[in-house]
Amino acid sequence: MIYPKIALAQSIIEICSAKGIYNIIISPGSRNAPLTIGFAQNPNFKCYSIADERCAAFFALGIAQQTQKPAAVVCTSGSALLNYYPAVAEAFYSQIPLIVISADRPQSKIDIGDGQTIRQENVFLNHSVFNANLTEDASVENDLKINKAIETAILQKGPVHINAPFEEPLYQTVSELSVEPKITNLEEFLETKIIENEDEIVSIWNSSKRKLILIGGINEANSIDDAVLENFAKDPSIVVLTETTSNLHHPSFINSIDSLITPFDDSDFKELEPEVLITFGGMIVSKRIKAFLRKYKPVHHWHIDTLRAYDTFNALSKHFVMEPNDFFKNLLPKTEFVTSKYFSKIDKIYDLRKIKKKQYLSKIGFSDFKVFEKVIESLPKNSQLQISNSSAIRYAQLIEIDPSIEVFCNRGTSGIDGSTSTAVGAAVGSGKPNVFITGDISFLYDSNALWNSYIPKNFKIILINNGGGGIFRILPGHQEKPVFNTYFETSHHLTAEHLAKMYQCSYFKADDLSSLNENLELLYNSNEAPGILEVFTPTFENDVILKQYFKELT
């Protein structure tokens, strides 16, 4: 086998192999040549070449999201490293393991005016779970840092940074290893299955007539046992609110939070106000539920997560450091159902909301809302759905999604910058049929996501083009003036047609219901190349239709 001559590069590669790191995404450069040579010629790794570092990092994020194992990104020195930052931040807040390996110049070359050189050490300090700043020569100390970085990424489910200085010459190779790096054993994190102060928690649970369970994004399928979900559904004192990205389903759960609470007045909110709020999963999309819980605070807010708990509603009283499934399997057998009208009252309101929604959708014209209804209805069963941020995820929250479909969205930092790249990486990582729904600004922002040769041929993009950032028409402050159109909405007349041609994707387009239905069928049946269906919706009608929807729910 061919190895890089530089011993430090050998150590990094051998430790990655020993730790089971498999997916390596490499961006081209010279300073990282020792790493590229070693990773690319080692059969223990699956390597990908992606030129744009921002896209490469989000591509790796998508793979790690699906495999639940760290993916590594490798880049040269200088500003290349900084382009990883959006994905590093997303990985940090979404609890996704990501290993950043950056090549650097030796310490003596930093801040002396040498080319392609920045201060790389600790550059991700505020959004990483470990930073390994290596010295130039191979050593046990460096080996321990590399081991620690990889183990921390696994145990703390977050991004780590390994910064490796290399001196020229960079391209020399050898046929035998010159090092035997030290490999440490992963210290297993023993997750507790015991509830702290259990008697007190059981007492609070059994005495509470209004228990609200709010579930955010969950990337792991079947994370909660069916028996636990059934218990939630049968308890009249429990209301369960799920976000689209929770991937948890039950007929009694409320899966369109905004449809339920947007029309509420003060008396309705007081009916929903919980005594106990239990949260688990990732970041919450719905601004309305966050505003509600910040105003109508629960007496007790318990968050269940093995790593961290955010005081999102300024009411956090207890963080249970354990898996949610373990928490409920431990707690529920010791509890009893409480006589309450909490669920029945809220469920009755939600049933009426669903009737009103069906009536409204049946009468509206072609628009973003109508398109989302038809697109989500059309999704193939047992496929995966990736959704971009901004208005796309918010529309998706309003539509029922088949329980067999897994849903993902970059809600850690909620940015539009890497949604397409993440979706492509997720399609590669999962191996499942994957549909990506995105808006025009998000798609154009990350169009380099299509600049790689790894996109599965059955990957589908449904691009909803409303001529700008449609979410700004929904938000407060919208005024039809040049400043709004130029600086907020960023109005445009661009299409994806020529991008699709350049990247050899099949291209379809629709601008009414008939062409949408026709081209959705063509899109799903076309698997010779990745497909893009671009749907053009009316810029000036979308926000009016959505706002009227919430008015007609009462």
UniProtKB/Swiss-Prot annotation:
- CDD domains named among the record's database cross-references: TPP_PYR_MenD (cd07037), TPP_SHCHC_synthase (cd02009)
Q: Which reaction does it catalyse?
A: isochorismate + 2-oxoglutarate + H(+) = 5-enolpyruvoyl-6-hydroxy-2-succinyl-cyclohex-3-ene-1-carboxylate + CO2
One Gene Ontology BP term is: menaquinone biosynthetic process
Q: What is its EC number?
A: 2.2.1.9
Question: How many and how are cofactors bound here?
Answer: Binds 1 thiamine pyrophosphate per subunit.
UniProt xrefs under Gene3D superfamilies: 3.40.50.970, TPP-binding domain (3.40.50.1220)
Q: Which co-factor is required?
A: Mg(2+); Mn(2+); thiamine diphosphate
Q: Which Pfam families match?
A: TPP_enzyme_C, TPP_enzyme_M_2, TPP_enzyme_N
Instruction: Please name the pathway.
Output: Quinol/quinone metabolism; 1,4-dihydroxy-2-naphthoate biosynthesis; 1,4-dihydroxy-2-naphthoate from chorismate: step 2/7; Quinol/quinone metabolism; menaquinone biosynthesis
Question: Which intervals of the chain form a coiled coil?
Answer: none
User: Per its database record, what is this protein's job?
Assistant: Catalyzes the thiamine diphosphate-dependent decarboxylation of 2-oxoglutarate and the subsequent addition of the resulting succinic semialdehyde-thiamine pyrophosphate anion to isochorismate to yield 2-succinyl-5-enolpyruvyl-6-hydroxy-3-cyclohexene-1-carboxylate (SEPHCHC).
Family designation:
Belongs to the TPP enzyme family. MenD subfamily.
Task: List the protein's name.
Answer: 2-succinyl-5-enolpyruvyl-6-hydroxy-3-cyclohexene-1-carboxylate synthase
